[in-house]
Amino acid sequence: MKALSLAVFVALTWVLDAQQTGALAQPGIKWTEDQLRQAVAPARVGRKLTPKSWPGNARVAVCLSFDVDNESYLLARGETSPTTLSAADFGAQTGLPRILGLLDRYQIPASFFIPAVSAIIHPEMIPAILKSGRHEIGVHGWIHESLAPLEESEEERLLKQAIDYLTKASGKRPVGYRAPAWAFSARTLGLLRKHGFLYDSSLQAMDEPYEIVSNGEPTGLIELAIDWTLTETPYLGRGGTMPSPELLYQLYKDEFDGAYEQRTMFVLTLHPHVTGHRAPMRHLDRFIAYMKSKPGVWFATGEQIARYLKNM
């Protein structure tokens, strides 16, 4: 009951924060030690899952992942400007075909996390992704909705809609999940367990795979952790801070080299409406070529990595 009360309190706080302009809300300064512990308890690090070896005695597992948002995140907040929507439509019309062509050239798999509405608007995308037989479809919300303000019943309804649509469109029930905007609510983890997901790829507590613990209980759910340094939108999206994709891909290379040395996992998250432009694609091409040049690199989908870890 205490945990539920805190979850409601936190959700209300987020809603109030969103309504404020210019005011910095700091509700946590008044929380008790008990409330602070409860606030962080829903999703914590459990067992580290980096194996002694990857398939084929590879040194590193590489998961290239793409969040295929397109117009969904704009539609979620009621944006209908044709100009604004056209910039997101670029992801389906141009970015995704370029990315699939690049992956075909290197014959490597990837995981595509798709808001169901994105696939509804662009029904040609899922068949194109699945054509090679190498790639995975994962859940990325219904309409790239913000989860925190939702009631649990509404969050579950949207999750079920997304699962059902993507299952029907792809012919296979997705086993991987990535939260819209990578932002869980206090209820999301419980819903993922309830609906039988194999793994999540939304959290950022480590740069290696781990089992998620919830309120002190091992969940059996595998986390393929991501990080804001390993995606392009903060740098190349609107309001981004990176002057050149070349600098961004140097960061990715250094992160990959570290994962290679540590014999663990490297997860890169990109967006077709951003990375699909000419300059980022040139650097992505060079980066994949660099990783392919190294011995002992296992390119895999999130599902392949998670199943390998599950069966250890």
Explain the meaning of each model-derived region.
Residues 217-235:
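A structural motif
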Residues 18, 23-25:
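Boundary at the C-terminal end of the N-terminal hydrophobic targeting segment
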Residues 174, 235-245, 272-273:
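Surface-exposed cleft-lining segments at the edges of enzyme active sites
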Residues 5-17:
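Bacterial N-terminal signal peptides
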Residues 229-232, 264, 270-273:
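Active-site clefts of carbohydrate-active enzymes
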Residues 27-176, 181-223, 246-268, 276-312:
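Catalytic alpha-helical scaffold of carbohydrate-active enzymes acting on polysaccharides/glycoconjugates
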